[in-house]
Amino acid sequence: MSATMSAMSNNGAFEDLESLREPQRGFHHLEVPATSPSPWPESLRPLECPITGAGRVTTLAEFLRVTSATALVVVVDGVLVHEWYGSGVSREDRLLGNSATKSALALVTGLAVDRGLIPDLDVPVGELVPALRVGGYERVTVRQVLTMTSGVGWVEDYHDPHSPASQLIARWRQGLGGVRTLLPGIPDGEEPGTRYAYCSPDSMVLDWARESATGTTLTEAVHELWSLVGAEHPAVVGLDAPVDRGGVALAAGAFAATARDWARLGRLQVDGTWDGVPVVSPTWVEASSRPEQPFLRPGRLPSTLTTHAGFGYHWWPLDDDGDRVMADGMRGQFVYVDRPRRTVVVKTSAWPYGDAWWDRQCRDLCYLALPAIAEAAAAG
């Protein structure tokens, strides 16, 4: 992958944009066709709202600039009301969600649960995937990987090139395959279900268990979802190797879609329906939007992650009731859902890779700004 633009993000330029826009040019992938496209109804209007954060009040335009936004899409009650794209990005571009992919995985997992294909979230993942009957996942349940409370001995550290996390990502980026073969070798750590730790292998184990239970790959599951919500454009699912060499989806972070179509996933998380037709059950939506344990509530997660959100079923709730949730991906990819206001805000970005200070500052600002944008848009 080559970058066509580079500069420090605080002047509005994008670092390594090409790794986030149409990212399939840099990795093995499968395309998810848009077989039943249904464009959003539109009532586009200017959007102005003050953004308060970092001790000052700024404008929406300045917020987009200083956080290196690449796209902003706002949908209120199923109507597209605001749309903006940064330089070099268009409404047709598929934008890599990074770990926002995990929230898409939660939705297709919900479909499997609703259909009884995963009848019990408290079943050990090893009962669905025999290869996981050893190692750190031996006693871990589907519920525990959904809530990232597996307790396995994993550190999400991509700065150390020799860390297991870096090795896993390298296998994907280099197309070496075999990502799933690494999962049984992850050791145990703490008692499952007793603490939260951000763990991308939990997402990969979840998808492996879902695939085993349903007989469908992530690409096939997303294809069904894409048809149900009338996606306008094909999406992309990244693989760890070519299909003919047994490549599987990197379910923790390699899904790309247009900003408009990312908004469809947010709209589905409002109440589980599409145009009044049930897609995912309200029971699943409610459960996935809320923290199940006190230590999963907003403000209770490790402060190195966020002080603004908790954790549900691969969604980040901003309150104990799950009224406001976020899909959150590395380098500034967000799908914010205000469920009572039936409003979705998609913001994609091109933050510098590996800059922990920049990431934390911008992430904190986005967790303050996106709710304000949703409230202003819903108010008309």
Language model: regions and residue ranges:
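Structured C-terminal helix/loop/strand segments within mature extracytoplasmic catalytic/sensor domains
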Residues: 1, 5-14, 327-380
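Catalytic-site signature segments of enzymes, centered on catalytic residues
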Residues: 83-85, 91-92, 157-243, 253
